[in-house]
């Protein structure tokens, strides 16, 4: 996991050099008005929902999600933002049988998390169509990572207390207290310009984290997906 995140950061840092030449981009509209790109700060505030991949029904794995970010646009193509995302993830079972003839077991649980991180952002509209400050729609792809701080995992521990053989229910990574784990993520932002300073944003991101995140052993990383809207 850490190796993948380091490689991701290294590749993104190389991209800074390739986009730096575009930092002084200019644009002239049909009326002859000339615009010069200026480096600038930006702020994102978003809310939406999360789907945590698991064995429960789809609806039982949905939870509210919130994200805030502050970033800097270095060039028409490249930007960097620090973001923080949370606040719940979910897990569970839907008609799960520990043995072939066992009784179907259905339950769900949630826990809290806060995940600060850094995203390397690439404006695809400016990359392929050139910089245009009056463009109504922009698509931006991003990759990044950070630290996931998780806690309040009592619900699954309460369920486990009534399960005789926890390993049969995949609960080999049951945890309590607070856990800090690295994560990597990628996603896309779709921005609709409302004014010179404000855009409506739709975002989707996929997050990869340790297999231990949802307390279950699956021999592969855990995933959660966020769908967000904001400004």
Regions found by a protein language model. Give the residues of each.
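Short glycine/proline- and aromatic-enriched beta-strand/turn motifs that initiate or cap beta-hairpins
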Residues: 23-71, 152
């Amino acid at each position: 996991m850490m190796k993948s995140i380091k490689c991701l950061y290294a590749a993104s840092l190389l991209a800074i050099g390739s986009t730096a030449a575009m930092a002084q981009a200019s644009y002239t509209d049909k009326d002859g008005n000339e615009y010069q790109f200026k480096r600038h700060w930006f702020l994102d505030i978003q809310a939406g929902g999360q789907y945590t991949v698991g064995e429960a029904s789809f609806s039982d794995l949905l939870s509210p999600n919130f994200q805030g970010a502050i970033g800097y646009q270095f060039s028409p193509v490249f930007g960097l933002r620090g973001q923080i995302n949370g606040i719940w993830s979910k897990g569970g079972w839907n008609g799960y049988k520990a043995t072939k003839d066992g009784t179907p077991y259905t339950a769900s649980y949630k826990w809290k998390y806060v995940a600060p991180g850094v995203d390397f952002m690439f404006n695809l509209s400016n990359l392929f169509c050139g910089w245009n400050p009056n463009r109504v729609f922009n698509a931006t792809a991003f990759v990044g990572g950070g630290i996931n701080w998780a806690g309040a995992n009592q619900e699954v521990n309460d369920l486990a207390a009534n399960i005789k053989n926890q390993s049969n229910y995949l609960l080999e990574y049951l945890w309590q207290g607070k856990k800090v784990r690295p994560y990597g993520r990628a996603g896309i932002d779709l921005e609709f310009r409302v004014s010179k300073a404000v855009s409506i944003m739709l975002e989707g991101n996929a997050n990869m984290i340790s297999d231990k995140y949802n307390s279950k052993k699956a021999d592969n990383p855990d995933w959660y997906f966020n769908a967000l809207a904001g400004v």
